Amino acid sequence: MHGYFQQALTVDVSNRSSQTEALSDAFLRACMGGKGLGTQLLLDRNPIGVDPFSPDNHLVFALGPATDSPLHGSCRHGMFTKSPLTGLYSESYAGGSAAIAMSRAGFDAFLIKGASDRPLWLEISDQGVFFHEADDLWGLDTFETEAVLRKRVAAKSPGILVIGPAGENCVRFAIVKNDGWRVCGRTGMGAVLGSKKIKAVVFHGNRKRPFADAQGLKAYAKEKLALYKDHAVTQAYRNNGTPMMVDILNKAGGFPSRYWSQGSVQQVEKINAQSIRERCQPKPKACRTCFLACGKSVRVQQGRHQGLTLEGPEYETIYAFGGLCMVDQIEEIVYLNDLCDRLGLDTMSSGNLAAFAIEARRRGKIDLEIDYNQPDQIAALLKKIVLRQDVGGLLADGIRPASEELGLEDIAVHVKGLEPSGYDPRVLKGMGLAYAVADRGACHLRTTFYKPELSGLIDPDQIEDKAAMFVDFEDRCTLFDTLIVCRFYRDLYPWEEIGNMIALTTGESMQKQDLQTLAARVTDSARRFNLREGLRATDDWLPKRLLNEALPDGRRIAAEDLRRLVDDYYRLRGWLDTGQLQD
């Protein structure tokens, strides 16, 4: 079958062995790649009810048929496992250039199982698997680790994926980084690697994916670049990146702030995209094969962090620290972003937990010097979390156990154990549905449904028939994650273009109905994984605070409206009203 190596590699770090197996045409047609492939492999290999930190929990790296192709937005890889944060299905994606190196090792998927008794770093190539001692790397931050390995590995342009001290200490929202600042950020992938004593995985090789129409792919990519290089979407991402959302959400009243008690901040000009342009000298930074260049390489120009350089901050980091924690200087947000990157922490979970800790301190539940707009106090807490010191040890296990231990479930904001992104569902009702039913917990990326609600495609307050558009967006995003192509190209790659990309890479002809069937099958697979791990329909719901408390302007999301949205979603998915699958 074109577009695949038709091979998966399983690495067992317990006995330092590896095994290659064939992937059949029928198997690949059923799941395609990326999310479809990673999810199916998890279903097939993971024992039901396995502890996420057990050696038997598999960590899957999956690629798609678009990987290492000329298609714009195709340099991405996915990671899949049972999350230590939620205890459920876990997926995360990253860009950069690592996916190309992974593909050239000659496999469609890499499965890691077992656990080492001492730190290791893995080298995976088209020549085999090599297990290297990593005692000298253990304790290094993510940047230090990648720098050492770039000097140590002789191969040209290796893909280097690393964890930081947070992953080593199994902080349940630890990240996996590559290419300096590209991140598989959510649901604790880094903690799973850390539990297996794996500090890094390095990929390289020289194999090329056999596409159905290699010349056609080049022509297609050239055509799309000419058509869209000056498009409004391209210019918006290139000029402002995701921080453009700060002003948009703040104006809409849906910018979560002061730990979900407000929908806007007063001095937004201190933390928006304009503040980055004025004070951080941003330069566009793109993943390989991408013309959007949504990333921004910044350098702080003045103040105590003068000279600090990083790629970011993204909108979600600004929301987490600038909104929830009320940090009102972009330079301080850059500082906290850099600290999280170095330690290997998810910035979204970190900001949510820091703001939760502020509220816990104000309520007398914890003894900790921390308050809003105090970046040094927030930084000190993040370091405690990584080291699992004092209250940091409690917060390192996530918002759900922390809120239960402190008796603060009524104010804790999460779905299935994962904290939401920066779109308040009391303003954007479709995002309420997104958070409620997303397979990995409160996630905005499974549908990116903030886009139609903010752009006027559909009224944010509409309930009737909203689920139909929602499912359409979710299906298309699922296919992006299955190919794998960056979902920021959603405005440039409509349904027919997805079919065109599949035809050029795999040779398979798929009409819209075929694509919808594939997307639904992948969605059902993730649902099946969650159901067997104990998911109930009551888990497809929003936290008490978002349902019981209105924003200061009076806007709220009613429980009956959320019930209607979820029920409509179940029906359109063909699920039972209990959230179970028909089969």
Language-model segment annotations:
Residues 1-93, 97-583:
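Intrinsically disordered, low-complexity segments enriched in small residues
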